[in-house]
Curated annotation (Swiss-Prot):
Subcellular location: Secreted, Cell wall
Tissue specificity of this protein: Expressed in young hypocotyls.
Alphabetical UniProt keywords: Cell wall, Cell wall biogenesis/degradation, Repeat, Secreted, Signal
Record's protein name: Glycine-rich cell wall structural protein 1.8
Domain of life: Eukaryota
UniProt region (8 X 22 AA tandem repeats of H-G-G-G-[GAY]-G-G-G-Q-G-G-G-[AD]-G-G-G-Y-[GA]-[AT]-[GV]-G-E), positions on chain: 205-380
Gene Ontology, cellular component aspect: extracellular region
Keyword RNA-binding carried by entry: no
Signal peptide positions on this chain: 1-30
Gene Ontology biological-process annotations: cell wall organization
Function, as annotated: Responsible for plasticity of the cell wall.
Sequence repeats: 205-226, 227-248, 249-270, 271-292, 293-314, 315-336, 337-358, 359-380
Amino acid sequence: MATIHRLPSLVFLVLLALGVCSARRALLTLDAGYGLGHGTGGGYGGAAGSYGGGGGGGSGGGGGYAGEHGVVGYGGGSGGGQGGGVGYGGDQGAGYGGGGGSGGGGGVAYGGGGERGGYGGGQGGGAGGGYGAGGEHGIGYGGGGGSGAGGGGGYNAGGAQGGGYGTGGGAGGGGGGGGDHGGGYGGGQGAGGGAGGGYGGGGEHGGGGGGGQGGGAGGGYGAGGEHGGGAGGGQGGGAGGGYGAGGEHGGGAGGGQGGGAGGGYGAGGEHGGGAGGGQGGGAGGGYGAGGEHGGGAGGGQGGGAGGGYGAGGEHGGGGGGGQGGGAGGGYAAVGEHGGGYGGGQGGGDGGGYGTGGEHGGGYGGGQGGGAGGGYGTGGEHGGGYGGGQGGGGGYGAGGDHGAAGYGGGEGGGGGSGGGYGDGGAHGGGYGGGAGGGGGYGAGGAHGGGYGGGGGIGGGHGGNVP
């Protein structure tokens, strides 16, 4: 009997609760509709509200959509011709999009906010478009602008806690993508009938940047590995390109410039860095590669052709460069904890080579209006030096813990000179030749030998303990 008496009370409480919920929903809907219904182009609001509006002498419209916990999505368009914009806000984020156009032009933009935001915008008297997407805790920015009959577009995507940036103008475009905790940057610019493009991608905790500029064509690429960064760029009235890639905890940079053609490449290994660049009215190129904890640098310059190469081993560094109105080249390679340097210069031909052994260093260089070459190699804890000028050549080799071996040759006119130096354990050898002369020097253990020759003579010196 008591249960029967409780039924009317339970029914009354249920009906009362339903009435309160319905009244609350009606009030919220009225509030949201009032806040969003005043955009010129109309708008629609989700859970957290959004804003959209558009206007123009021709036609304009905008819409915005907000996702869960979104601070809002913004979209708007204006134009004497046509303009439109749309924005989307994701989880706990905001997306921004806008477009504008004048004359018969049109502008379109898209912004998508992943968790915590994205932005996109476009402008253009011709046509402009932009796109932006934000990943988790990140922000993406994209924009495009164009004038005349030109067009511009930009795209970017932000990864987790990262950001990407892309811009484009004229006939240019850019893209940027950000990885986990990183950022990617990409941009392109072009003038006249030119075209420019760039791309950048960021790995975990790293960043990549790429950009291109050019009245002709310019392009760049950059990619960042874990905790590292890569940067690449190209510039040129003719064509220029660059590439850079960064390994773990390292960085690589590459760039190219040239009225004719220029290119560069740089790659960084673990904890190291490589840099390469090329410049030239004719053609110039460079390459640099860095090994573990080391770095390599290479560059080339030349009205004719110039090239250089540098490679770095573990904890070491190598550098190589070439310069020349004719042709110049250089090479350098390094072993563990050491360094090698090589370079070449010449109006005719010049070349150099250097390689470094463990904890040592080798140096080689060549110079000459005719032909010059040099070679240097370093043994364990030692160093070798070699150089050549004119029609001469030199060689130097360093032994175990040796102060080094030194060799050099010089020659003038039709003359030729050569020199050789060899350093033993803890010792040093020196040799040199000038004119039509030659010299040799050999150093024994803890000793040193010296030899020299001039004219058409020769000399030899040796010291053994």
